[in-house]
UniProtKB/Swiss-Prot annotation:
Family: Belongs to the radical SAM superfamily. Biotin synthase family.
Entry keyword set: 2Fe-2S, 4Fe-4S, Biotin biosynthesis, Iron, Iron-sulfur, Metal-binding, S-adenosyl-L-methionine, Transferase
NCBIfam families for this protein: bioB (TIGR00433)
Name of the gene encoding the protein in the UniProt record: bioB
Annotated protein name in UniProt: Biotin synthase
InterPro entries assigned: Aldolase_TIM, BATS_dom, Biotin_synth/BioAB, Biotin_synthase, Elp3/MiaA/NifB-like_rSAM, rSAM
Amino acid sequence: MKDYCAIEQIYHRPLDELLGEALQAKKLSGRNGVQFCQLLNIKSGGCSEDCKYCAQSAHYRTPIEKGALLDEEEILQAGLQAKEKGASRFCLGAAWRGLFEGETKTKKICKIISKISSLGMELCLSAGFLTEKTALMLKESGLKVYNHNLNTGPSYYPRIASTHRFEDRLQTIRIVQKVGLKLCSGGIIGMGERLKDRLEMLFCLYSLPEAPESIPINVYMPIEGTPFYGTPPLDYMDLIRMIATTRILFPLSRIRLAAGRKLLDEKTLTLCYLAGVDSIFIGEKLLTQSNVQLEKDYALLKKLNLRKEER
């Protein structure tokens, strides 16, 4: 069991040693391909939470308009299209505080999950905070994976949101693991946080009873109207070291390069794969922001002699 200081030492290793160990750790999973995931925003905007990086918060004036929950047929068709494009995981995101007992939307989400479970894809949901009862309802409906990111470390968290606490996020993560759902949990880097905050986040994930099944690493994308707009861009080497350190700590977890991939050039993306990334989001949009074109993903994988993971 590594402590925070040990994680910090890993991060600061000479780059050749860091990448070499990350490659060895990646081999332990036995996976050879890159997983394709498709993310669908099933309910956009109007969120009650005040996360300062988020275009979907009702607290800020952004280009994102509040939308109603998509109906079952729209979601089903989007899932079929994702499957045709090669996605093996279908991820649904909803902008609200969470899912709680007695709410109409909770019943609607469970009904949607039951219907699209027949697609033959692994289904993931990101819908905010849960209670143990609602987590069980989701599982019984056919959900396999629940996403709930820590986003940053506990020291920096009060700087990014005031409508909930870091401990609230940890509580939902504990519930997800307790009921037997697979956990997807990671964070965002480049929001003005310190290295210490990023490593604190990794340490919190590392301290869980069970490692997350997947860990998304998001590069902050500045969105006009949000408080963090204008934050200086992330140094690409910070991203590479973060990915490699995550891979070493979590050899069996999927490391997913999520939001912000469009900001990275081909050389940086190549280093990301070398550092341990084995999962990406495909599709034209990631919730509210544009994504890398699928043709470019395939072209880079071909150039690197990497293959898409088959179902």
